[in-house]
């Protein structure tokens, strides 16, 4: 009996299923890649199918083909051992085997080409912001939304979170497997906890584009605010921010002194808001230690604690994923003309509506659409008629403010993640510069405002026009609290950036 004439080894259910999977997967890969190239569609779930699911399906199919053939051959060798040799014979003089060999070579070349192209494109896909930000849509929506409106919106996620080199690429992908599992099993945190553990040092990533020596002199900055009153009175703070020192000077000074000098610290909490210990390495190699006088650490605690060397991220901890307070967002929208400052109490009312708790984005949008026009119809009916278009435009922008800074599904709001730049809503600079960190000889880390910024001018309802302001004037008279209390103690508690709101509000 000639077994080949009756049926080949590949004619079995397992091998046929493998053939079917391989052919279908190949067709789908080619079709979807062609569609992406022709239409320009870059959808994360299409990428997941094309670069992972379909190649996996192809490989599985090609594994099933020889498994099925091997099972049939073993079975036939058991039945007719004299006609089936222990090992396959490759005889190129046999036309049938020659054709099979040519088919095998061509199929292998096609397989390698398809898998190679899919692997390269798959690698590029995993490096894309589409993969990082949109594939796990619910989990990453807050971060992706913040990135889209950030100063680094044209910088890919991997350039900061992974950086150059194969070592950190492998580490990132291995860490990513744990995160994928957390998403699949819904075991991730609400909200995502920060700072991220084992994040690549900022000197390896941030300093690919930025480095402390690049920023020399000061930078003028004007902060525009509006009082939460009927007139939305404009307030203006004009400052010189002392970023660095004199170009090519050996004297480190300004804000970036912290990076030019070796500074280490110990934080009590995960978010690094409570810093009881700071150590500065002097040029002669000696170490100067500053201890919190109110809550000092013992020597034993210092020895056991994790010491972190200060880098960019200790101040610029939200360089891209930035969430802004409703008050600050309203200031920016009013000064840009997107929201009409002529609408009475528009800042106060909008902030109050935005700060209400909502179960979903849809509920928040519905509340904004209802409450803002209702407020003007009830309290300022003439304004509601004359400025109906401005009110509708304000509604659209307030909804956008909510969408960019509040994410109920992930339990994220603008205040969830402290931003250490400045000291307005969080302690920021005052974590160390609080006047309470002292050395054993009595030297303190100064809280002098002029160390980091210098007042050029200020305008406000309580400042006479034309008056030259050299020191900051608070919009409300708070006495010595201006110097004895941190800004964030009041502003974060009230979720506002300015005092002076009086009269109607409460939509």
From Swiss-Prot:
Concerning InterPro entries, the annotation shows: Cytochrome_c-type_ET (IPR051174), Multihaem_cyt_sf (IPR036280), NapC/NirT_cyt_c_N (IPR005126), NapC/NirT_cytc_sf (IPR038266)
Where is this protein chiefly located?
membrane
Chain's gene name: imcH
Q: Please name the Pfam families in this protein's record.
A: Cytochrom_NNT
A single BP term in Gene Ontology: anaerobic respiration
Where does it live in the cell?
Cell inner membrane
- Induction remark: Constitutively expressed.
Q: What is this protein called?
A: Cytochrome c-type protein ImcH
Cited function:
Redox protein involved in a high-potential metal respiratory pathway. Is required only for electron transfer to terminal extracellular electron acceptors with redox potentials higher than -0.1 V. ImcH likely transfers electrons from the quinone pool to a periplasmic acceptor.
Q: Which SUPFAM superfamilies does its entry note?
A: Multiheme cytochromes
Any one annotated GO CC term: plasma membrane
Q: What is the lineage of its organism?
A: Bacteria, Pseudomonadati, Thermodesulfobacteriota, Desulfuromonadia, Geobacterales
Q: Which residues form a coiled coil?
A: none
From which source organism is this entry? Geobacter sulfurreducens (strain ATCC 51573 / DSM 12127 / PCA)
Q: Where are the transmembrane segments?
A: 14-34, 45-65, 100-120
């Amino acid at each position: 009996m000639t077994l080949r004439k009756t049926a080949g080894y590949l004619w079995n259910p397992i091998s046929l299923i493998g053939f079917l999977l391989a052919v279908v997967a190949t067709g789908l890969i080619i079709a979807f890649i062609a569609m992406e190239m022709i239409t320009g569609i870059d959808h994360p779930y299409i990428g997941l199918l094309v670069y992972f699911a379909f190649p996996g399906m192809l490989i599985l199919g090609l594994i099933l083909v020889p498994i099925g053939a091997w099972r049939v051959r073993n079975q036939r060798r058991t039945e007719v051992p004299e006609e089936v040799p222990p090992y396959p014979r490759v005889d190129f003089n046999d036309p049938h085997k020659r054709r099979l060999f040519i088919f095998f070579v061509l199929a292998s070349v096609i397989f390698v080409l398809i898998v190679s192209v899919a692997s390269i494109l798959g690698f590029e896909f995993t490096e894309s912001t589409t993969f990082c930000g949109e594939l796990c849509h619910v989990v990453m929506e807050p971060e992706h939304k913040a990135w889209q409106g950030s100063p680094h919106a044209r910088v890919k996620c991997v350039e900061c979170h992974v950086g150059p080199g194969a070592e950190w690429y492998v580490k990132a992908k291995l860490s990513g497997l744990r995160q994928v599992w957390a998403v699949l099993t819904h075991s991730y945190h609400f909200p995502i906890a920060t700072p991220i553990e084992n994040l690549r040092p900022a000197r390896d990533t941030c300093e690919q584009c930025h480095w402390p020596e690049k920023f020399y002199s000061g930078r003028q900055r004007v902060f525009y605010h509006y009082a939460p009153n009927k007139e939305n009175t404009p307030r203006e703070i004009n400052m010189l921010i002392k970023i660095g020192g004199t170009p090519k000077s050996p004297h480190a000074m300004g804000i970036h002194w912290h990076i030019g000098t070796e500074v280490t610290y110990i934080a009590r909490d995960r978010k690094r808001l409570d810093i009881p210990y700071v150590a500065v390495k002097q040029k002669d190699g000696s170490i100067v230690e500053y201890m919190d006088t109110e809550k000092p650490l013992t020597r034993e605690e210092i020895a056991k604690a994790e010491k972190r060397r200060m880098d960019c991220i200790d101040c610029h901890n939200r360089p891209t994923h930035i969430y802004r307070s409703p008050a600050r967002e309203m200031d920016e929208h009013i000064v840009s003309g997107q929201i009409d400052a002529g609408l009475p109490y528009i800042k106060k009312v909008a902030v109050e509506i935005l700060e209400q708790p909502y179960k979903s984005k849809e509920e928040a949008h519905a509340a904004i659409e209802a409450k803002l026009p209702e407020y003007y119809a009830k309290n300022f009916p003439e304004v509601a008629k004359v400025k109906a278009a401005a009110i509708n435009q304000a509604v659209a922008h307030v909804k956008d403010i909510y969408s960019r800074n509040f994410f109920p599904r992930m339990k994220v709001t603008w205040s969830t993640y402290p931003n250490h730049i400045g000291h307005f809503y969080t302690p920021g600079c005052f974590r160390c510069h609080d006047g309470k960190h002292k050395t054993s000889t009595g030297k303190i880390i100064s809280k002098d405002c002029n160390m980091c910024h210098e007042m050029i001018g200020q305008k406000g309802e309580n400042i006479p026009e034309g008056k030259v302001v050299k020191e900051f004037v608070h919009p409300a008279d708070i006495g010595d609290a201006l110097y004895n209390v941190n800004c964030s103690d009041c502003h974060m508690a009230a979720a506002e950036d300015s005092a002076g709101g009086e009269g109607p509000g409460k939509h």
